């Protein structure tokens, strides 16, 4: 997330300090827009231009292109969809995470529901975060 794009919105993003707080305390997280308005799915479909300009500024900094490439690689290795990788990543944190989702079609809803059983290994989480393999 481009933190500068959040200025004046009243919205907070999970940065390193907040991630550490949740990890250390076990406090649950409820990420709103857990799928970043479908960013990675849109990237996978070559439809990034359908993302609203404000959302593109917020969710599409260069680091997310690198994260997308890693998510796409992991999706190919596991047979999961990009959406399932994204939600699986959130639900594989060392604290309870309850992603808020907003599917816009029956197909998106089905894909999202299938993500409910996805737990990634610590190695897969590390790969998504850093690109490093064990």
Identify the residue ranges that each predicted region occupies.
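Beta/alpha (TIM)-barrel catalytic core signal, keyed to glycine-rich beta->alpha loops juxtaposed to Asp/Glu
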Residues: 1-133
């Amino acid at each position: 997330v481009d933190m500068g794009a959040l200025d004046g919105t009243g919205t907070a993003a999970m940065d390193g300090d907040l991630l550490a707080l949740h990890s250390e305390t076990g406090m649950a997280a409820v990420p709103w827009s857990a799928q970043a308005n479908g960013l990675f799915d849109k990237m996978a479909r070559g439809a990034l231009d359908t993302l609203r300009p404000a959302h593109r500024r917020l969710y599409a900094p260069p680091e997310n292109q690198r994260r997308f490439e890693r998510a796409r690689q992991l999706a190919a290795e596991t047979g999961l969809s990009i959406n399932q990788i994204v939600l699986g990543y959130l639900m594989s944190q060392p604290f309870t995470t309850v992603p808020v989702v907003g599917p816009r079609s029956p197909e998106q809803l089905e894909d999202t529901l299938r993500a409910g059983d996805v737990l990634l290994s610590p190695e897969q989480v590390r790969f998504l975060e850093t690109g490093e393999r064990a």
